[in-house]
Amino acid sequence: MPDASLFNGTSFITLFAPNISLFQASIDFYTDRLGFAIKETSNQKLVWLQLEEDSNNVSIQLLLDPEHAASVSQIDQNIRNLTRSLYRKDWRSIQSNIAFKSSSLSKLVKLLKDGGHPVQQSPNEISPFEVYTLDPLGSLIGFSGFKNPFAVNERSLLPKVSEEKAYRTEDDSEKLFTPIRKTIGVMTSGGDSPGMNPFVRAVVRAGIYKGCKVFCIHEGYEGLVRGGEKYIKETQWHDVRGWLVEGGTNIGTARCKEFRERSGRLKACKNMIDMGIDALIVCGGDGSLTGADRFRSEWPSLIEELLQTERISQQQFETYQNLNICGAVGSIDNDMSSTDATIGAFSSLDRICRAIDYIDATANSHSRAFIVEVMGRHCGWLGLLAGLATSADYILIPEKPASSREWQDQMCDIVSKHRARGKRKTIVIVAEGAISNDLSPISCDQVKDVLVNRLGLDTRVTTLGHVQRGGTAVAFDRIYATLQGVEAVNAVLECNADTPSPMIAIKEDQITRVPLVDAVELTQQVAKSIESRNFKRAISLRDSEFVEHMKNFISTNSADHVPPSLPLEKRKKVAIINVGAPAGGMNSAVYSMATYCMSRGHVPYAIHNGFSGLARHESVRSINWLDIEGWGSLGGSEIGTNRTLPNDADIGMIAYFFEKYGFDGLILVGGFEAFISLHQLERARINYPSLRIPLVLIPATISNNVPGTEYSLGSDTCLNSFMEYCDVIKQSAAATRNRVFVVEVQGGNSGYIATHAQLACGAQISYVPEEGISLAQLEMDINSLKESFANDQGKTKSGRLILKSENASKVLTTEVISTIIDDEASGRFDSKTAIPGHVQQGGIPSPMDRVRASRFAIRAVSFIEKHSDKCQAFKNSISFRQTDEITSTAVVLGIHKSQLRFTPIRQLYDFESDVPRRMRKNIFWSNVREISDMLSGRTSL
C-alpha cells in the first residue's frame, strides 16, 4: 500500500457518514485502497483509522452520524458534479481537500483506478506531481510526491535517461511514460468555412493541455482513408500558432466517395488504429457528421473484420474496442437544426453585408437595381439576415415561397412605392435555393427580367459566390469556434461506449451538447418539409430567432407604404434618444424603431443631441422615411449623443417638452449614462406626470457593462474593429521577431472586451479591472514570456500580444508595463505599446449589431404598445404611488442566454449594479478567461 502522511501534521480528521452502507464503504476505501489500519472501534458507530507506517500518528475519526453528515442525495450530487467536471476543472478550485504525501503515485493511481475511483492528476497524466480522488462520502483526498506541497522543483518523477538514450523506439517510450489519456484525431470535412482553423487550434491545444495526443487528419475523409504520416500528422502546441487569423481550413477538406463504402471505412479504421487514435472530432456539415456517426456505429464490426483478416493484433483489438466521436457544425449556411449558429455563418453574413454596402454606392449613383445572389441551399438564413441588416427592398428565400405571380406582384409593388417616395436604389437579395410554392427554382435572371420589363429599371445581377466563404473569421466565429473546440475535447474524454455521439451546439448563447443523430435528422426534415410544401414546419425547424427576424423584415420593409396595422385610437407618439458614447448599432435601432412605428401607425420622434439638446434647444424632430433611408448601415449616431444626464440638463424642462409633444413612450439607446438617465426619469415620475409613460432602455455600449443584459449593441462591432487592429499589430510583432506589443483596451471597469479579444486575437496575456494586476502575476507573466521566446528560436510567427484594460491598474499603466518588460528582457526581446483609442468604436456596424438593434427596437415599441394604456390610468393621478405595477413600466431590455427580457430599472439599480464603478455585479465571462489562459499557456495566480 502507498505510504502517506498528512502535510500539515494535524492529529486527526473527522468524517461523518449518513448511513451504515456508506460508513462501511468508507472503511473499506481507506483500508483496502489507501493502506489505513483500524486503530480502535469503541462502538459500532465510531472507527479510528491510522496509517500503518505513519510516524506522526495521523488518524481519521469516522462517525456514523446522520444528523451531522450530508444527506445521501447531497453526497451523490456532489460526486456526480465532481466526476462530470473531471476533465474540465481543477477539483481544488471547487472543493476543499485533505492532502497527503505518497512516495509511489503510480502505484496509488493504479490502486484507485482498479477500484473504479475517479482520479485527477496534476499537471498532467504523463508526469503528475499530485493526484486527487473522491472517497465514498464525497471528500476530496489529495496525494503528492513532494515533501513540501508548494514545491515545484523536486526531482523528476520520470526515470533518468542518458542523453544518448533520449530517443527510443515506440516500445521503449511506452515503458518510460504513463499512457496518454486519449489520442484524438481532428478533421474538417465538406465545404470550408471561416472559423474552422480556430476550431482545430482549440482542439489541438485543449487536447494537449489535458494530457492527450492530437493528430490532424488532412484532406478530410480522403486523408482518413489514405492514411499514413502524409495525411495523419501528430500536431504540437506551436504548430497551430497564428491559425486564428487564417480563413478556410489549413488541414484541408475534400469530398470522399470511397468513405461512403464499407471498404473505405475499413481502411479508415485500420489507419486510425495504426496511429493509435481512439477519439475522432469532425467539423463539417450534416453529411460529414452523418458519416462520422455511421463510422462509429460500424466500428465494432470493422475491428472484428480487421482481427479476423489478421490486419490488427489481438492486443490492438482489445485496446481499440470503442471509438468516441464528436461533431461540430462548420457551415456558412447556418442550416443545422438544434444550434443557433454554425461555425462560419456570421463571417459569411459579414462578407455579404460588406458587399451590399459597396454595391449601395454604385446603385445610388446610377439609380440602378441590383440583384444579389447569396448562398444557402435549402436555408434562407443568410438571405434573411442580410436583407434585415442592409435594409434590402425585397428578399427571396426557400422558407417563404409564393406563387410566381404573387412574388412578382409583391416585389414590384414594394419597389415601385420605394421609388415613388424618392429612393434611388433597389436591392433584391435572392438565396440560391429560392423557390416558388410549386417548388420551381427562382433565378436571378428571372428577377432581373421582372424589374426590367415591368418597372423599366436599369438592373444588374451580382453573384457573390465563393467570396462568402473567404477571408478571416469575424470575432463571433473565432470565439465560439474556439469554445466549441474546447468542449469537443471535453466531450470525447467524458463519453463512453453507451453515450450517443454528441454534437457541439450553441443554444441561448451557451455551448451545449446535443445528440448528433437527432440534430442531423431534424436538419434533413427541413429539406423534406420544403419538398412536401410544408413550409410552416420548415421555418419551425430553424433557430429560435428566425421567425422573429422574418416578421421584423416584413414590418420594417412595408413602413409608410401600406395602411397601418393598428386602428387610429391605438396609435401612439414614440420618442427615441441616444445617450452616452457612440456605439455601433445606434442608427440601426433608430431606423428600425421608426420604420416599425410607421408600419403600425405610430408617429416616431427623434430627440437630437441627447437630453441637453432637448432641454436647451427643444431638439425634437418627427422622423421621415426617406430621411433615415440607409441609416441601418451607418456607424456613430446620426441624431447625436452625449453623456449629459436628465438631472444635469434640467429634468423640469425635459418633462415640460414631454408634455408639450405628448409622448406616449420613450426609448433610450445607450450605455451606463442611459442606465442612470432611466433611473432618474423613473424617480422623477412622482413629481412630473408627463414622465409616467413606458420607458425602455436598449443597451448600446462597447463596454457591455449595462446591468440586465449580457449583450449591448456596439460590443460586437468593437470586438471586430479591435480584433482587426490586433491582427495587424501581431503581424508586425511577428515580422520583427522577438517583440511584444502591449495594447490598451477600452471598456472602463469592464473586462468584457479584453477577455473576448484575448480569445479572438490569440493574445498571450490580458489584464482586466475585475482582477487587477499584482506584481506576482506580472513577474510570472514576464518569466513566461522569457521562456516562450527562448523556445521560439528558429520558429516563425514569434510575436506576442498583451492586452491591458485601461482601468486594470492606475499604477501599472500600459507604458509602465511595457517599460518593465523591456527592462526585464535584457535585450532578448523588446516591448512596444499600441493604443487604438476610439478606433475601437468601429466604423460600419457589424451585421450582428444591426440585426440585434432591429430586434431590440421592435421589441421596445411592442412593450410601449402593451403598457401605454396601463400608464395612462395613473398618469394624472394626484396620489401617485410607486407600486410594482408602475415600476415595471420603466425597464432595461436585455439579452439573457439569447432570450430577450424586460427588467425593471429599480430592481437592477438597487440590487444588480455597482454604480460607483459603473458596472454590473454579476460577471458572466469568467469561464471565457479560464479558456483564454488555457489556450495561451498562461498560468494565473
From Swiss-Prot:
Pathway listed: Carbohydrate degradation; glycolysis; D-glyceraldehyde 3-phosphate and glycerone phosphate from D-glucose: step 3/4
Residues annotated to bind Mg(2+): 286
Residues that bind ATP: 191, 255-256, 285-288
Binding site for beta-D-fructose 6-phosphate 2: 331-333, 375-377, 432, 466-469
Major location category of this protein: cytoplasm
One BP annotation, GO: fructose 1,6-bisphosphate metabolic process
Protein name per Swiss-Prot or TrEMBL: ATP-dependent 6-phosphofructokinase subunit beta
Taxonomic lineage from the root: Eukaryota, Fungi, Dikarya, Ascomycota, Saccharomycotina
